Amino acid sequence: MLNNKKLFWAALIVLNSVALGILFSGYFIKADYSLGQKESSYFIGASYMTMNNEFYKIMNEEISAKVEAEGDRFILRDPALDADRQKEQIEEMLQKGIDVLVVTPVDWESLSLILKKAKAQGVRIIVVDTNVYDETLADSTITSDNYNAGMIVGKYFLEQCKEAELIIMTHEATKSGQDRVQGFIDALSGEEGIKIVRRIECEGQTEIAMPRLQEAIDEGVHFDNVFCLNDLASVGVVAALEDNHMLDQVGVYGVDASPDSKALIKENMIGASAAQFPSKIGRETADTIYGLLEGKETEKNILVPVELITPENVDEFGIDRWQ
C-alpha cells in the first residue's frame, strides 16, 4: 500500500505540473494535422473543453487518425476551460474555412451565437461529450450516457450505506456534469438517511477540487462521503482527504474510470466509478464526420453506454489505460 501511495503522489505532482504548464504557456494548443493532405480535401476543426484531461486526448486521437487516413485536414484548438477563448477559436476556424466543427462546450449555454454563424456558413456541427443548450444547432450530439453514469454510481452507493452526509463536487457550466449529479441524486431519492451537506463547484479539475474540499474541511463541514462529477475531481478529493488523514473515514465515488481512479479503486481509496469510453466516442465522432460530409443520414443523438467499476471488477478493465 505504501509504495502505491508514493506512486499516487508522484503521479499527482506530475499531473499538477502539467496543468500548471498549460496554464502558463498561453492556455491553448494550436495543432494542424495536414500530412498527406489530398486535393479538394475537407477541413475539420476541433475545440474540446480542455486538453488538460487525458479523456479528450484519447478521443481526439481517434478523430485525427481518421481524418489523416482520409487525406483531409484537421486543426485542434484548446480553450483551457475559457468560454470566451473557445468562441474566439471557433471564429478563427470559421475564418479558415472549416467544413466540420467538433466541439465540447466549456459553457453549454454560451455558444449559440457562434454556432448559428457556423451553420449559416454551411459548417456541419458535431457536439461531443456534453450537450449545447440549443440542441437544434448540432447536426449530431455524441456523449456518454451521463445521467445513467450518476445513477449507477448512486445505486451502488446505496448498497454500501443507508446513512451518509454527502459533499457533491460539481461543474455547473456543463450539461454532462449536471446530468451525472442529477442521476446520482435521483438514485438516492426517498432515502431519508442520506443528507447532502454541501455542493462544491470544482470545474472538474484536480487542482481546483483539492483546495476547495480543503476549504470545506477547514470550515468544519461534517461529511463522510463525496460524489465527484468526474475522476479528475476524485483525484483532487482523495489528495485532500489523504492530506488530512481522513481517507479511511470518507468514501469517494466518481465518473470516468480513468487509469488514475482505477488504480485508486484497486487500493480501496475510491469506492466506485462509472466508466466512460473515450475511444468509442472518438470513433463514433469520426464516423459521423464522414457520414455528414458524404450526405448520409446520421443519428441526431448518440449515447455511448457506461459501466460501473468497483473493487470487485476493476481488474477486468485494466488500470494502466483508458477503456
What are these regions (language model features)?
Residues M1-S41, K116-Q121:
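Short, low-complexity disordered leader/linker segments with a strong preference
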Residues F8-I13, G21-Y33, A187-L188, F277-Q323:
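Hinge/cleft segment of the Venus flytrap/periplasmic-binding protein
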Residues F43-E62, K66, E70, F74-E92, ...:
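Extracytoplasmic "Venus flytrap"
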Residues Y48, I63, M151-I194, R198-R199, ...:
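An alpha-beta-alpha
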Residues F55-D72, A149-V153, S176-I194, I208, ...:
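Short, solvent-exposed amphipathic alpha-helices that sit
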Residues Q86, I142-L166, Q178-D179, I208-M210, ...:
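Hydrophobic alpha-helical segments within soluble ligand-binding/sensing domains
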Residues V100, W108-N148, E159, D256-K266, ...:
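Flexible loop/hinge segments that line or gate small-molecule binding clefts
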Residues V103-A118, F184, R198, E203-K262:
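Hydrophobic alpha-helical
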